[in-house]
Amino acid sequence: ALKIISLIGTNVRKIILGFMVATSFLSMWISNTATAVMMLPIGIAIVKQMSNLKSTDKKENIIFGKSLMLSIAFSASIGGIATLIGTPPNLVFAGILQEIYNVEISFLKWFIFGLPISILLIIISWLYLTRIAFNFKQKEFKEGEIEIKNELNKLGKISYEEKVVLSVFILTGMAWISRSFLLNIFIPSLDDTIIALICGVSLFLLKTKNKNGFKERIMNWEDAVKLPWGVLLLFGGGLAIAEGFQSSGLANWIADNLTKLNGFSLIIILMVVIAAVNFLTEITSNLATIAMLLPILAPTAIILDVHPFILMVAATLSASCAFMLPVATPPNAVVFGSNYLKISDMVRVGILMNLISIIIILIMVYYILPIVWNFNPFENPFQ
């Protein structure tokens, strides 16, 4: 993360861009909460370094602090959109699709569609934060480069163990991306879950290195119990809710009552779904919201005679774009705890980002998704 920030530059706007690129990249692969917690201390150190400068106006430092904190929160949420493992709603979508239609969404299939959306939202949110929401008078901040170098020096050279974990991480990502068009030729039954398990277990087998040679494992059970297993329980609960909705007939009953939507065009229905999920997740868990809505949207697609992907993907993406309130997402709560932001700041800046994300998701899902995933949005093949 620090390397990415140092490479992008010391201009105030570039520092914020560096934080957003680093945060979003990390969020593609690890929990957005962990990413925000990791990036926050670095951001606070940069803001404090700027406040110590005699040339820095107090108001300018406050503006920079707010913008940097929001950039961390926004990019942590946006980065998760890019990959299937980036955020729990994406996994719930894949799981429910497998449960209801026995259709697999591979890592690569989601990545091809999710990454461009993530990049587009990062660019737009950076321009919005640095040129519209906040206006910086102080353009240069060379001391920021010094602080970043200090943080890098504290870390020291990359260790053997870090190299091992990085290698496993790269191999995992490459295996996920190449599975559908390369690895399945040699191992037809290989799927993304097996790849994840193999690479995860390998960390328990590979050993660390010290002056006396190899001794401990890279990971042990004490490390494993500290992992956020609650997310997996929530994920399992979401699939159980989906099955309950289907088997009880509740999903079909709700879908039947949505027949009034039949008179509207698909793009209007999409806009309603995206906006509803977007603002609903401001006050509720995005995982719970998606687990509740996706089993309803599947039969609703049959009633409306549209492809279920179009409604389900739209809802899934919009669940990751709640930028207004501290309770909306864990990254929002993390940066709010830094005391650089007020709720009014988050609402003022976040509401326009919500609206921007609604428009971007609407355009991408309606026009691009059917092309990338090769389906007819006005035809339901699962009837």
Summary of predicted features, one role per range:
Residues S51-N135, S159, V334-V365:
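Membrane-core helix-loop-helix motifs of multi-pass transport proteins
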Residues P295-L304, M312, T316-Q383:
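In a subset of proteins, long, contiguous C-terminal domains/tails are tracked
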Residues V12-F25, N52-G79, I105-F113, L266-F279, ...:
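Alpha-helical transmembrane segments of multi-pass membrane proteins
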Residues A1-T56, G230-L304:
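Membrane-embedded alpha-helical segments and adjacent helix-loop junctions characteristic
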Residues E99-N102, K109-D256, I274, L352-I358, ...:
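Hydrophobic transmembrane alpha-helices of multi-pass small-molecule transporters
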Residues A36, S118, D191-G200, D256-I269, ...:
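Structural signature of hydrophobic alpha-helical transmembrane segments
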Residues I4-I8, N61-F64, S71, E147-K157, ...:
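Membrane-interface segments at loop-to-transmembrane junctions
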Residues T33-K48, M69, A82-E99, E143, ...:
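Re-entrant/interfacial helical elements at transmembrane boundaries that shape
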